[in-house]
Amino acid sequence: VAMPLPQCIETRAFTLDDERIELTAVVFAGITHILVPVSLWGENAAKKAERAARVWAKELPPVFGLLLFDEKEKSLKPLVAVEDVSLIWERGCGSGTSAVGAYLAAREKKDITVSLKQPGGVMHATVSYQNGAVTKIEITGSVAIVAEGTAYL
C-alpha cells in the first residue's frame, strides 16, 4: 500500500516530570508521530507514554501517536491519541510504520526496508530516499478484522 509522505521530520523538545526530552517528530497531514525509544522509560514505558500523551496533548495536533520503538528488536508499540475522544494502544499502525521507516531512511540518507514487530503482527515499510528527501513509502502486512459494530460517541 502506498502511503503519504511526511511533511517534515524534525527533533522537538518535550518535558515530562521536569525532565526535558528531545524526540523525533514525523509529521504527516492528519497525524504527527513522536518516536520514543523504549530504552528511555524502561519497564515503565507504557505508563509513562500514557501520561506523556495527556501532558503533551496541548502542544501536539488533535491526532498524534507516541511510538514506543525498539530499534534493536525492530519492535513498535503504537499509542494513538485523538483529542477529546480516545487514547488507544493499537495492535498495528500503518502510519506509525511509515513514520519509523521515513525516520530511518532520512537518518541513514538511503533507501531502507524495515520489518516492525507490533502487538498484532509484523508490518513492513519500504522507503525510497533521494536528493535529501523521502520520496516514496510503501507498507505491507497482514490485517484482520478483530471487531465489528457501531460506536456511539
Feature map (PLM): residue ranges:
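Active-site proximal loop and beta-alpha junction motif in alpha/beta enzyme cores
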Residues: 1-92, 98-153
